[in-house]
Each structure stands twice: as C-alpha cells, then as structure tokens.
C-alpha cells in the first residue's frame, strides 16, 4: 500500500512538472537522485532549509517554496500585528524566482515585504533587518554549495538567524501547511501593494558604517587581487574600496561576474585553495601581494599572500582570525572591557592572544547565531571588538549580526597596507603572534561514514568518549572532557564535574594543557569532524596519530 501511495505521489508531481520551475534540473538527475526527492522531506532547521532542485517534497521547487512561505506567513502573523520583512537573494539558479514567490505569499497575508531588484549579500540582509526595523528577514542562498543547490535562511528582528526555539516554532507552522501540491496562492493587485521596493538608502547606510569603521587606508604600494567567485560581493566590494580611495586592486574578471553555474571555479569555497587558482595567476602577472576571495553570498572570506619570489602562503580560518584579532586589539587600545567571541571549535591561539592583551573572551556553539546571541546580551560597558568561527566567518563591528566578509575586506587591506609601509607582511605578523603567545596550530579532519555501519561507528566513537574518558591521548594528559550534549564537564585532574551554561549540542571537547581536540558529528549528513588545536612539537604528526587512533 505504501509503495502504491508513493507511486501515486510521484505521478502527481510529474503531472505538475511544467509548473515546478525545476523540470530541467529533474530531467538531468539520475534515477536515484529523482527517487530521493519523493522519499524524503525538506526540513526547516536552525539554519533554515538547504537542498537540491527537483520534484518532490525532498527537493526545492515552486511548490515546496510556497509551502515554506505560507508557513512563515502564519508564523509571522502569530508573532505580531502587521509584520514586515526584507528579502535578499544571491546569484544562484532560481534565487530571483524564489524571492518573488515568497514575497507574493507573504503579501497575500498582509505582510509588508521589502524586495530589491537585484542580488545582495548575506551581511547586507542582516544589516537591512536592523536598519529598516523589520520583524524578520529572508536570505535566499546556499553559500558555497554546488550549483544545483539553493536554500532559505530566516532572520529575526535583531538581524541574526532565528534562535533554536524560534526556528522550531516556525518549523511547526511550515509542517502544518501539509501537501505543497494542494496550496492555492491567489494573487491580487491589492495584495501585491504590500511588496515595496528596497530603499537604496539602506545600502548607503551600510557602506557608511564600514567607511566609518575603516576611516582610511594608508598609502603604500600594496597590490591586491580580488575574486567574488561569481558571487554577490561585486560590485559592492570594489565600490567600497574606491570610496575609501583604495584603487590598487585587480579583479579576477572571469570570476567577478554573477554566474549560477560557477563556470570558472573548481570550488566556490574560500577554504579550498583551488578557489584561488585564477587569483594566483593574476597575482603572478600583476606582482600582487594580497589575494582575497569571498564565497557566493559574501559572508565568508579567505586570504593568501604572495611574496617577492612568487611563493603563495594560504592562511586558514584560525590564522586569519588571529591576525584580525591582533589588529583589532591594536586599533582599540583606548577601550576598556574589550570582548572577543569565538566558537568552541576555534583555535587556542586567539584565546591565548586575548589573554595576553587582557581582552575577555567567550566561547559559543558553532553557528554564528550563537555569537549574535552573545552580542545581544552584552552589558552597556562591554565592547565587542571581534568575533569569528574557524570556518572563515568573521565580524569586526556588530552593526551586522552575521558573518560579514564585506566589512572584513577593507579591514584586512588596511592592515596589510600598514604592514607594507614597515616592510612587513601578514605572514611576518603571524610569526610575531606565535613568538608572543606560542605556536598554537590547528587542523580539521572530516570523515564521511555512509550507511548504517557508518552511523553506528559515529555513535560508537561519541559513546566511547562519554563512557570511557581517556586519561591521555598521544602522550597528552587529559585535564577535562566537555560534553555539550549533557552540559557537563568532567575534570579528570580533580575527579569532579561542573555544568556548561550552553544550549545542548552533540559535541565533545577534550582539554589538555597544550590545547584541545573536539568531535562534532553532523546533524544532517553521515559526517563527523575532528578538530585539533594544540601547542606541541611535531604538530602535524601528533594530529595525524590522534586522527588514526580515533578513526582506525
């Protein structure tokens, strides 16, 4: 019976394929990919919805987007009278169409919608929610995922992604909508009057906030290469740099045009060195010093540096975080009660740097919304000078409540330009940080363990650390084990336990005098990540042995 219903369901979807907006994507998929769309459902989680295009409730299409929008409309109307919302969208396939569908559904429920006529960055959406004082915001993007993906992120009135409680409530409203093929969305002129043009003044205000933050970029002979990886950071980043009288940059022209197919990049992820391939070619031709890339929705940023001999140094997210924190400490020396915020899997290096400079630090769960929650709870006398995640997400000033590569681009250029005046580089500055607080190094191992056996393996690893906490790992004495699922810390050196004041998450962190390792399974994929952050000899060898010991 169940198989018959599934077949009927598939036939109904195929009958509506011409109206789905995704027929072309569906026809290009394998039989397995097509079947997955009918055998699963998209779920609205803490980061919204992200998935492939295709037919069925497990894929993004006109009907599943209408279901999402209708659920969100009911959620917003239940929260407040006369809600308002701003929608932004990136350059991906169907981002514009999805934005219009969502706007129409929300307008149909008397929700005022601010909708731009062109693509925007994620940090601009966060800023716009705060600037326009709207009830919520929606960003249509799938960050650096492949070209056949898209997604919807929902933001609250503070410009941060919805809290866990709010996203769970919104999810219930979405699920109550039922079958997406049964939704009827009447459109009338009266309803479309709720859709308003997005004010240009908001973009101007965003630019002014960054200009005020930067002040000026000192004149040096620093040369920069920039790539948007076909994403949204062009034209806003070049316009911003020019407004700061910095013109010593070259764009990777082929990659600085919006392209939903990401035609000229092997990877649209600034964490991946391959994302810099064309930037390196241009840097070698133009003798550039600094290479910068942003991901497609411009919330994350990667950098590399070219020396006089043409050697390229790539900086990981923790190293960029350390450099930016170091610079922000220098810039804010006149402030008291300074605070830095980072995720629990980010480096010991930045914590050591903060301690050395008498800067308070706080650690939060992974996900920038947790950083935003800390910012929201700041006392009046506290000054947040920097926040970051090791996954290349940074924030210098909190007029935005999400990762913001747009504000970081001119900041890192200003830093590099100042260093160039003294004949120094970012690599030199990082080495100085190591000499000051110690050579804390970091690496990440990501394991995909498919199938039932893979799931059991992941559960077994986490259970082992919980029930049989190791006394030492590769000669490193364990001080404590933090379990964010039980909200407990077991202090092995004292044989005591204490509580963690944090939302629950399936993460275990093992602490040593030399640093930590952390284990974090994915909640949606058959993956588990091992983070290693240590100050020790032969770091690479030690990290590899720890990885082999856990996953052998």
Swiss-Prot record:
BP-aspect Gene Ontology terms: enterobacterial common antigen biosynthetic process; glucose metabolic process; purine ribonucleoside salvage
Family statement: Belongs to the phosphohexose mutase family.
Reactions catalysed, as given in the entry: alpha-D-glucose 1-phosphate = alpha-D-glucose 6-phosphate
Pfam families given in the database record: PGM_PMM_I, PGM_PMM_II, PGM_PMM_III, PGM_PMM_IV
Keyword vocabulary terms for this entry: Carbohydrate metabolism, Glucose metabolism, Isomerase, Magnesium, Metal-binding, Phosphoprotein
EC category name: isomerase
Species in which this protein is naturally found: Staphylococcus aureus (strain MSSA476)
Any one Gene Ontology molecular-function term assigned to this protein's record: phosphopentomutase activity
Binding site for Mg(2+): 143, 295, 297, 299
Name of the protein described by the UniProt record: Phosphoglucomutase
Biological function: Catalyzes the interconversion between glucose-6-phosphate and alpha-glucose-1-phosphate. This is the first step in the biosynthesis of diglucosyl-diacylglycerol (Glc2-DAG), i.e. the predominant glycolipid found in the S.aureus membrane, which is also used as a membrane anchor for lipoteichoic acid (LTA).
Superkingdom: Bacteria
EC number in record: 5.4.2.2
Keyword Phosphoprotein: yes
Cofactor(s) named in the record: Mg(2+)
Active site positions, chain numbering: 143
Pathway: Glycolipid metabolism; diglucosyl-diacylglycerol biosynthesis
Cofactor binding, note field: Binds 1 Mg(2+) ion per subunit.
């Amino acid at each position: 019976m169940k198989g018959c219903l599934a077949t009927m369901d598939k036939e109904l979807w195929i009958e509506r394929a011409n109206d789905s907006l995704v027929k072309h994507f569906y026809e290009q998929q394998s039989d397995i990919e097509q079947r997955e769309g009918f055998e699963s459902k998209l779920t609205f989680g803490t980061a919204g919805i992200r998935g492939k295009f295709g037919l069925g409730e497990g894929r993004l299409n006109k009907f599943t987007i209408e279901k999402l929008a209708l659920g969100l409309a009911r959620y917003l109307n239940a929260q407040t009278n006369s809600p308002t919302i701003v929608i932004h969208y990136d350059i991906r396939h169907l981002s514009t169409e999805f934005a219009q569908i969502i706007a129409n559904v929300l307008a149909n429920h008397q929700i005022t919608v601010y909708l731009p006529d062109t693509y925007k960055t994620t940090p601009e959406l966060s800023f716009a929610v705060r600037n326009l004082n709207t009830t919520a915001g929606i960003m249509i993007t799938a960050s650096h995922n492949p070209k056949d993906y898209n997604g919807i992120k929902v933001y609250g009135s503070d410009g941060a992604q919805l809290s866990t409680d709010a996203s769970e409530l919104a999810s219930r409203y979405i699920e109550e909508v039922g079958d997406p093929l049964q939704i009827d969305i009447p459109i009338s002129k009266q309803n479309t009057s709720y859709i308003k043009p997005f004010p240009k003044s908001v973009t101007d205000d965003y630019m002014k906030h960054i200009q005020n933050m930067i002040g000026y970029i000192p004149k040096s002979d620093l040369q920069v290469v920039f790539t948007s990886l076909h994403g949204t950071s062009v034209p806003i980043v070049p316009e911003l740099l020019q407004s700061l009288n910095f013109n010593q940059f070259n764009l990777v022209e082929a990659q600085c045009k919006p392209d939903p197919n990401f035609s000229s990049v092997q990877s649209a992820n600034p964490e991946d060195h391959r994302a810099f391939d064309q930037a390196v070619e241009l840097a070698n031709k133009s003798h550039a010093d600094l290479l910068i890339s942003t991901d497609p929705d411009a919330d994350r940023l990667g950098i590399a540096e070219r020396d006089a001999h043409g050697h390229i140094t790539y900086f990981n997210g923790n190293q960029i975080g350390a450099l930016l924190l170091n610079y922000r400490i220098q810039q804010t020396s006149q402030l008291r009660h300074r605070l830095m915020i980072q995720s629990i899997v980010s480096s010991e290096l930045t914590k050591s740097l903060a301690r050395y400079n008498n800067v308070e630090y706080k650690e939060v769960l992974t996900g920038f919304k947790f950083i935003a929650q800390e910012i929201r709870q700041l006392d009046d006398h506290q000054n947040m000078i920097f926040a970051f995640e090791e996954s290349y997400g940074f924030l210098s000033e909190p007029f935005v409540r999400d990762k913001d590569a747009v504000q970081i681009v001119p900041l890192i250029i200003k830093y590099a330009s100042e260093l160039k005046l003294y004949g120094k580089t970012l690599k030199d500055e990082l080495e100085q940080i190591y000499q000051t607080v110690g050579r804390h190094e970091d690496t990440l191992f990501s394991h995909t363990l498919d199938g039932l056996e893979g799931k059991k393996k992941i559960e077994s690893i986490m259970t082992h650390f919980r029930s049989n906490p190791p006394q030492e790992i590769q000669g490193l004495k364990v001080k404590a084990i933090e379990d964010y699922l039980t909200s407990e810390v077991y202090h092995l050196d004292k044989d005591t336990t204490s509580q963690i004041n944090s939302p629950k998450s399936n993460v275990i962190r093992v602490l040593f005098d030399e640093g930590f390792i952390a284990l974090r399974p994915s909640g949606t994929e058959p993956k588990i990540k091992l983070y290693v952050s240590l100050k020790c000899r032969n770091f690479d060898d030690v990290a590899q042995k720890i990885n082999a010991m856990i996953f052998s």
